[in-house]
Amino acid sequence: MEKSTWTTKVGLAQMLKGGVIMDVVTPEQARIAEEAGAVAVMALERVPADIRAQGGVARMSDPELILAIKQAVTIPVMAKARIGHFVEAQVLEAIGVDYIDESEVLTPADEEHHINKHKFRVPFVCGCRNLGEALRRVAEGAAMLRTKGEAGTGNVVEAVRHARAVYSEIRRLQSMNEDELFTYAKQIQAPYELVKQVATEGKLPVVNFAAGGIATPADAALLMQLGVDGIFVGSGIFKSGDPVKRARAIVEATTHYNDPEIIAEVSKGLGEAMVGINIDQIPADQLMARRGW
């Protein structure tokens, strides 16, 4: 039963492949995202840039806001729960969200355990920085992965680092024999069966999107060319000068990621991009990507 349920959830996430998922904080923003071609929206009270700027404890959004956003659009609605906070996840499932993001953008609720995602009917998306993190999350029941990046910075460097790390590790696996795979599984603290599956198939068992710091159409196309299956855009759209135009442009660039002429065309006259932050200027205790284990 559990296996078939997980397979169904993975199939649901596959339906988002090649698309853009946008962070929204109001029903109006959700409508803009849907009209721009987003395949789903992430309902939030504050985008990551505001969470980063305002500090404090970041928790699950008010269910009333999530329901208002659900009523405003016909595309799937995601919402974030804190790492390890299975009751926030239970609440999100109870109000009918389509996907739950167990997210390092919120303040972690548990410093040892992630949520056991097999206990839920709703598919989960989780962040990863490398293959070990990716496969640990899949073992816990994640139906979809994303790079962690460094959310709320408008700086794509961490998302690139995480995507490259995952795909280079997959390529390494493919040249290993069974003995080496056993040892490697122990080194990256991932279940051997999953490691072996990835080595055999040459790909992750679930879709892997890029997230964290994507601010321009070129950023989105860069990650797609690196091999991700789709794009999450957080603060990059509604913290920019012309959100409607930028949202459409990022969708176009994600669809036509191998066509520089189209990317050039949609990148024209987008107005001011969000103000970015250099990663090395962020104090270590404020780096979101390090949250999770």
Swiss-Prot record:
Binding site for D-glyceraldehyde 3-phosphate: 164
Active site (record annotation): 80
Keywords annotated in UniProt: Lyase, Pyridoxal phosphate, Schiff base
Residues the record lists as binding D-ribose 5-phosphate: 23, 152, 213, 234-235
Superkingdom of source: Bacteria
InterPro entries: Aldolase_TIM (IPR013785), PdxS/SNZ (IPR001852), PdxS/SNZ_N (IPR033755), RibuloseP-bd_barrel (IPR011060)
Pathway in which the depicted protein is active: Cofactor biosynthesis; pyridoxal 5'-phosphate biosynthesis
Record field: catalytic activity: aldehydo-D-ribose 5-phosphate + D-glyceraldehyde 3-phosphate + L-glutamine = pyridoxal 5'-phosphate + L-glutamate + phosphate + 3 H2O + H(+)
Enzyme Commission number(s): 4.3.3.6
Residues spanning the membrane: none
Biological process terms in GO annotation: amino acid metabolic process; pyridoxal phosphate biosynthetic process; pyridoxine biosynthetic process
HAMAP family named in the record: PdxS
SUBUNIT field: In the presence of PdxT, forms a dodecamer of heterodimers.
Family assignment from sequence similarity: Belongs to the PdxS/SNZ family.
Protein name listed in UniProt: Pyridoxal 5'-phosphate synthase subunit PdxS
Protein's organism: Chloroflexus aurantiacus (strain ATCC 29366 / DSM 635 / J-10-fl)
Gene encoding the protein: pdxS
